[in-house]
C-alpha cells in the first residue's frame, strides 16, 4: 500500500513538473508575430522573451512615436483609402500584384484588403530579423531607431525615399525589407503565423535547393486578419527590367495566380520606358483592375476597347525629378475626374494627387465586372496654374525601391 501511494505521489509530481515546464519552454521562443509587434511598437505576448524589453525607455519612446505616426496616417489616408476601395471596387480578385512596391504592404492592404494572396516585388533583398531578445545592450534601441528612420518618408508622404532607407536598413542588426513588412502587418491588425524563405526557378516553380543564378529569392509570410481568413504575402527580390524578367521565372510564377488586381504607385515612371515593356504587358494582360497614379502605365498602352477608366483627383503632371513624363491624354481624361479626399504618390497633397482606376471589360466588351464607380460629369474648367514642386527630403530622390 505504501509503495502504491508513493508511486501515485511521484506520478502526480512528475505530471505537475511537466505541466509547469512546457509553458516555460514555449515562452523561451520568440514568435515572428511577437517580433513584428515589438518592432511596430505594440506589446508582444505577456510570456514572450521580448516582454521585459518593453520596459526599456527606448522601446517606450518608439511605441509612442509609432502610435502617433500611424494614428495620423490612418486618419489622413488609410481609412479614406479603404472607404474609397469599398465604394469603387465591386468584386476584388483573390490575387493582388504590386510591382515596384518595396515592402509597402500598408497601401496594398488599404486598397485591396479583401485579397488573399499578395505578390510584392522590387530589387531590395528580403533581409532578416535577428532574435531581438539576444541583442547586446543598446542594440535594441539602435534597431528601433533604424526602423523609424526607414519609415519616415512613407509615414509623412506615401512612398519610400529608397536611398535613405537602404542605408538605414543595413546599418544595424536588422536588414532588408522583412522588418518593414513585419511593422506594416502588425500595424494593419494582422497576426503572423509563419515566415518562410522561398525561391523561384526559371520556370516559376518554388524551390529550396540547387538555386541557380537566375533563381529569384524572396519570402512567404502566412498571416490572418480579424476575419480569421488565412492569407499569404510573397515578397520577391527581382529585377523587373526586360532582361531581368526574361532571365527569371518571376512572371511565370505570377501567371499561376492570375487574373488578379494590380497597384502601381510612385514607380519612378519606369513603365513609361522601353526597358520595362515585358512587365507592363504582363500587368495589362493579367489584371482585372489596375489602380495607379500617373507614374504607372501610360494611357497610350491601354486598349481603349478593353478598358474603362475612372479618374479621381487632379492631374498636375510629374514632379521636377521626372521631366518629360507629362501626358496630354492623362490631362484630357482627368477633366472629368471625380473628387478624392486623400493624397497619394509623389504629389502627396490631396489637392494635387491623381488616381486612376482602370477596369478591364469582359471579353464580349459588355458591362463592367469589377468596379461600381459611376462616371462623373466633367467639372467646370478651373484657372490653370503651375503645379507646386514637392519639397525634397534629405537623403535621396524618389526612385523605385531598390533602384
What is each stretch, according to the model?
Residues 89-90, 178-191, 211-213, 225:
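Short, surface-exposed basic-aromatic patches at helix termini and helix-loop junctions that form
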Residues 1-6:
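N-terminal secretory signal peptides that target proteins for export/translocation
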Residues 136-176, 192-202:
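Extended amphipathic alpha-helical interaction segments
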Residues 101-113, 119-120, 157-182:
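Short, thiol/selenol-centered motifs that function as redox-active sites or metal-ligating centers
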Residues 20-26:
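Sec/Tat signal peptide C-region and signal peptidase I cleavage site
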Residues 27-153, 231-403:
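Non-globular targeting/processing and membrane-anchoring segments
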Residues 8-19:
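Bacterial N-terminal signal peptides
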Residues 169-172, 194-235, 239:
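Short aromatic loop motif centered on NTY/YTY
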Amino acid at each position: 500500500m505504501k509503495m502504491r501511494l508513493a508511486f501515485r505521489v511521484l506520478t502526480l509530481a512528475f505530471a505537475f513538473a511537466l505541466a509547469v515546464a512546457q509553458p516555460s519552454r514555449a515562452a523561451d521562443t520568440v514568435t515572428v508575430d511577437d517580433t513584428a509587434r515589438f518592432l511596430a511598437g505594440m506589446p508582444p505576448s505577456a510570456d514572450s522573451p521580448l516582454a521585459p524589453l518593453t520596459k526599456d525607455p527606448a522601446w517606450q519612446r518608439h511605441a509612442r512615436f509609432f502610435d502617433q505616426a500611424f494614428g495620423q496616417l490612418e486618419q489622413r489616408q488609410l481609412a479614406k483609402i479603404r472607404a474609397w476601395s469599398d465604394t469603387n471596387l465591386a468584386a476584388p480578385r483573390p490575387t493582388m500584384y504590386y510591382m515596384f512596391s518595396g515592402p509597402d504592404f500598408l497601401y496594398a492592404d488599404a486598397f485591396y484588403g479583401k485579397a488573399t494572396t499578395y505578390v510584392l516585388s522590387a530589387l531590395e533583398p528580403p533581409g532578416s530579423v535577428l532574435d531581438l531578445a539576444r541583442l547586446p545592450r543598446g542594440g535594441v534601441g539602435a534597431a528601433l531607431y533604424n526602423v523609424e528612420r526607414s519609415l519616415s518618408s512613407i509615414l509623412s508622404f506615401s512612398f519610400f525615399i529608397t536611398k535613405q532607407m537602404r542605408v538605414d536598413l543595413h546599418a544595424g542588426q536588422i536588414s532588408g525589407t522583412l522588418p518593414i513588412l513585419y511593422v506594416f502587418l502588425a500595424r494593419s491588425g494582422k497576426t503572423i503565423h509563419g515566415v518562410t524563405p522561398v525561391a523561384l526557378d526559371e520556370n516559376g516553380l518554388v524551390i529550396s535547393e540547387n538555386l541557380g543564378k537566375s533563381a529569384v529569392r524572396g519570402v512567404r509570410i502566412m498571416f490572418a486578419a480579424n476575419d480569421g481568413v488565412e492569407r499569404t504575402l510573397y515578397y520577391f527580390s527581382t529585377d523587373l527590367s526586360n532582361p531581368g524578367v526574361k532571365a527569371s521565372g518571376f512572371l511565370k510564377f505570377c501567371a499561376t495566380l492570375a487574373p488578379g488586381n494590380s497597384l502601381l504607385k510612385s514607380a519612378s515612371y519606369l513603365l513609361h520606358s522601353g526597358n520595362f515593356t515585358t512587365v507592363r504587358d504582363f500587368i495589362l494582360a493579367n489584371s482585372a483592375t489596375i489602380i495607379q497614379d500617373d507614374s504607372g502605365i501610360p494611357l497610350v498602352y491601354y486598349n481603349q476597347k478593353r478598358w474603362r477608366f475612372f479618374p479621381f483627383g487632379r492631374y498636375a503632371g510629374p514632379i521636377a525629378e521626372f521631366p518629360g513624363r507629362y501626358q496630354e491624354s492623362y490631362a484630357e481624361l482627368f477633366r472629368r475626374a471625380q473628387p478624392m479626399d486623400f493624397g497619394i504618390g509623389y504629389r502627396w497633397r490631396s489637392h494635387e494627387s491623381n488616381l486612376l482606376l482602370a477596369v478591364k471589360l469582359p471579353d464580349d466588351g459588355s458591362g463592367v465586372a469589377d468596379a461600381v464607380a459611376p462616371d462623373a460629369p466633367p467639372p467646370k474648367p478651373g484657372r490653370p496654374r503651375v503645379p507646386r514642386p514637392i519639397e525634397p527630403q534629405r537623403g535621396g530622390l524618389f526612385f523605385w525601391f531598390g533602384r
